[in-house]
């Protein structure tokens, strides 16, 4: 199973189209906030489930965090700003452990990275629209097989 992961499109519908074109075989998508309209577009384009959380720039009644289980892997989703993710991933890691999740996904920083801490794989897809800290436009994918998950960053 392949989960496509993106965040922080901030109104850039062309970015969503580029992401989908780069990963048309995704079985589902995680959209980590700051682009609810683009999350809706992705769902229409792909015809696949799109799990979303609310970003600090989103309005409306959207969950601020969510736990999903795919292929036997528990995945914690949040935008990240409520966990001071711009400083470090420690609070995010603790929340994922508390929820018994093997993977934590976040956005907000616009900086693509994958790290491992406290038995949790922590993934930020960066931004396909406005990346920061010299990173390229990007998204991430999570490949799930036999109850384990492996993330990678995909540059656009």
Spans of features found by a protein language model:
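Binuclear metal-dependent phosphoesterase catalytic core
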Residues: 17, 70-71, 94-100, 123-156
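Active-site environment of divalent metal-dependent phosphoester hydrolases
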Residues: 10-14, 36-40, 57-62, 83-87, ...
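Active-site neighborhood of phospho(di)ester-bond hydrolases with catalytic His/Asp-centered motifs
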Residues: 5-7, 28-34, 51-55, 77-79, ...
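N-terminal active-site segment of His-dependent metallophosphoesterases
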Residues: 1-48, 58-64, 135-138, 144-146, ...
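Short acidic, glycine/proline-enriched helix-loop-strand junctions
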Residues: 48-49, 114-129
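Pre-active-site segment of Zn-dependent metallo-hydrolases
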Residues: 11-22, 77, 83-96
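Helix-adjacent hinge/juxtasegments
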Residues: 49-90, 99
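Conserved beta-strand segments of alpha/beta enzyme cores
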Residues: 2, 49-51, 74, 121, ...
